[in-house]
């Protein structure tokens, strides 16, 4: 547990090689950081350091950056799983130079309407880094496709192959994250 700059405790798990490229994983709602252990193990095998930040509705870009600052992380690849992807998009769009890549699971850019027609943030700027969106349904695929106009960098939309969630698609998700950590 860590205390954020906003004064609330949040679960944070930092593991992997200390000198590896950092991957920040923003957990989905009702998923403990331990739910990402199998994914983190694969990422560690690729030489990557992982920081999993638990879900909390009070978590803001300011508090997420505060966590990274306290851990000495100046830049990373950011991964967001569903509700965590909402924050990941915002971080990637508003903290230029802090993130080298974005992987979002089942969420499009905040300016794109979701399945219910709602737009999460009309004012969210475009993302200027390489981005991958993994999707589990045709509706999310449509939102991901529409998000491309808000990404000024390499952009991929990938169907989740497993049983339609990140936990059961660990190998595929790890592969997509490793691709985003590469500078090629």
Set out the residue ranges of the language-model regions.
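Conserved acidic catalytic loop of the alpha/beta-hydrolase fold
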Residues: 59-76
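Post-His helix in hydrolase/transferase enzymes
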Residues: 162-182
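Conserved HGGG/HGGXW glycine-rich cap/lid loop of the alpha/beta-hydrolase fold
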Residues: 13-57
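The feature captures the conserved acid-bearing segment of alpha/beta-hydrolase catalytic domains
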Residues: 110-169
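Hydrolases whose catalytic domains are alpha/beta-hydrolase-1, hotdog thioesterase
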Residues: 87-91, 113
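Gly/Ala-rich beta-loop-alpha elbow adjacent to hydrolase catalytic centers
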Residues: 79-88
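N-terminal cap/lid segment of alpha/beta-hydrolase-fold proteins
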Residues: 1-11
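A conserved short beta-strand
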Residues: 97-114
